[in-house]
Amino acid sequence: MKYSIQFYEDNQGMLMINVPDEIFLVIDLLLSDIQEDRSKLWLDLIDKVLSKQSSYEELTGNACTLEIKYDVTKIVNEYAEEDQKAYCLIETAELKQILLMWDDAVRNKYTE
């Protein structure tokens, strides 16, 4: 894994994640759109692109839109303020790994 990712529980017991600044919108994607429902829908589209069944897929959730291409996925914050960066780029395969790790963290939290 290229990025250093840390999962933890906040003081209210909510599952949280720390990621490097260059992929900061992964936090919004996980906490606003995917939450604790797991990421199957998102992973299905990523897999469709990575398997070259499709060259491009797009999915919009509560806060973020994913623009998925084979090499790179653009995560766009639909509600970014004017003074905020509205998007970040992440390698599609890396995003897939983070989503799988999130699903594992959710599963572990609720099967304890």
Give the label of every model feature segment.
Residues 1-56:
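Negatively charged, low-complexity tracts enriched in Asp/Glu with abundant Ser/Thr
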Residues 107-112:
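Short acidic DE-rich linear segments
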